[in-house]
Amino acid sequence: MASEREQISRKVALIALIANLILMAGKVFFGLVGDSEAVFADGIHSAADVVASIAVLAVIGISNKPPDQDHPFGHGKAEVISEAIVGIILVIVSVYILIEAILSFVKGPSVPQYSALFAALISYVAKEILYRYSIKQGKKWNSKAIIAIAYDHKGDIVASLAAFIGVLLAIIGNSRGWSYLLYADAIASAIVAYLIFKISMELIRPSVDVLMEKSVDPELIEEYKAVIFQCDQVKRIDRIRAREHGHYKLLDVRLSLDHDLTIKQGHDIAREIRNEIKRQFSDVEEVLIHVNPYFEE
């Protein structure tokens, strides 16, 4: 039976998939009918979001599987892979939109219609709601997959806002005879491309760090040390390493205890420390503790 975390993750991803399908169809249609490069480009972005949502749905079940013989540390990194996939998709989309914006400058500006303006506005409102919901659930369940979806929605928010402003300026320019404002739609497309690329980097960089097993923040290491030193028998921490493994963390600790202690006493102390760390840090999945004998110098 799926855990509550997995059920919520699937629900968020499914809502994102359905919303992106509807918004994609609407923005592509009204972008073409309403003669707006920016809204059409935003629609292509939503098409990529559909692919991203499917990718996230595919890995949610995998990431929540318990450890097995082939994957003794669990499957948490599957979420990180989905985060990287979403980031790569957004890079491709940003490049495509930028190329289309440049071509729009070359062939000359078009005059967007009000239908394109309303499509951008509806997209902005819908994505704002979806972002707030997704980021809340992502942080609550410490899910990189859901947070990736939230960042994707965030990209749509700024993209739809830029498209709305660009279309509005172009419409105003056409009605007032200010021809230079007709280029606002194409400029908005270029801005959309930049903003999407920026958000893609916010997804790719941390996912690469996790896949390369970068250490957690030094401040968090100090918090782990403070918990360990709560045990009076600990004479010294020889080494402590911690890394993210998707939605949970793994710790490797070497510490020194008095050399007169028996193996059982050392084992019991290590178990108490392990349990206390996991009690205080709910996202810590495993703590491997190696005990060294301590001699007074």
Swiss-Prot record:
<dbReference type="InterPro" id="IPR036837">
    <property type="entry name" value="Cation_efflux_CTD_sf"/>
</dbReference>
<feature type="transmembrane region" description="Helical">
    <location>
        <begin position="12"/>
        <end position="32"/>
    </location>
</feature>
<keyword id="KW-0813">Transport</keyword>
<feature type="transmembrane region" description="Helical">
    <location>
        <begin position="177"/>
        <end position="197"/>
    </location>
</feature>
<keyword id="KW-1133">Transmembrane helix</keyword>
<comment type="similarity">
    <text>Belongs to the cation diffusion facilitator (CDF) transporter (TC 2.A.4) family.</text>
</comment>
<dbReference type="InterPro" id="IPR002524">
    <property type="entry name" value="Cation_efflux"/>
</dbReference>
<feature type="transmembrane region" description="Helical">
    <location>
        <begin position="111"/>
        <end position="131"/>
    </location>
</feature>
<protein>
    <recommendedName>
        <fullName>Manganese efflux system protein MneP</fullName>
    </recommendedName>
</protein>
<dbReference type="Pfam" id="PF01545">
    <property type="entry name" value="Cation_efflux"/>
</dbReference>
<dbReference type="GO" id="GO:0008324">
    <property type="term" value="F:monoatomic cation transmembrane transporter activity"/>
</dbReference>
<keyword id="KW-1003">Cell membrane</keyword>
<feature type="transmembrane region" description="Helical">
    <location>
        <begin position="43"/>
        <end position="63"/>
    </location>
</feature>
<dbReference type="Pfam" id="PF16916">
    <property type="entry name" value="ZT_dimer"/>
</dbReference>
<dbReference type="InterPro" id="IPR050291">
    <property type="entry name" value="CDF_Transporter"/>
</dbReference>
<dbReference type="GO" id="GO:0016020">
    <property type="term" value="C:membrane"/>
</dbReference>
<keyword id="KW-0472">Membrane</keyword>
<comment type="function">
    <text>Primary efflux pump for manganese. May prevent manganese intoxication.</text>
</comment>
<keyword id="KW-0812">Transmembrane</keyword>
<feature type="transmembrane region" description="Helical">
    <location>
        <begin position="85"/>
        <end position="105"/>
    </location>
</feature>
<keyword id="KW-0406">Ion transport</keyword>
<dbReference type="GO" id="GO:0005886">
    <property type="term" value="C:plasma membrane"/>
</dbReference>
<dbReference type="InterPro" id="IPR027469">
    <property type="entry name" value="Cation_efflux_TMD_sf"/>
</dbReference>
<dbReference type="InterPro" id="IPR027470">
    <property type="entry name" value="Cation_efflux_CTD"/>
</dbReference>
<feature type="transmembrane region" description="Helical">
    <location>
        <begin position="155"/>
        <end position="175"/>
    </location>
</feature>
